[in-house]
Amino acid sequence: MATETIAVPEIHCDHCKTSIEGALATIGGVERASVDIAARTVTVRYDEASVDRGALVEAIEEQGYEVPAQ
């Protein structure tokens, strides 16, 4: 298992949290996704053999949030 913290500067409310966590929960291999509204980050615990960072970023961006290049 790997843990990735992804900065998402546009996070600002509970709707953002619900939207992003819900999108990540649908990805096979994601064990847990947690949005920190105050820090504007998403922490994801996932099986790196099943999913990669690119898929996580894509799921966040599909919800309408920009993820800056790392």
Predicted regions located by residue number:
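Flexible metal-binding regulatory segments at protein termini and peripheral loops
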Residues: 1-70
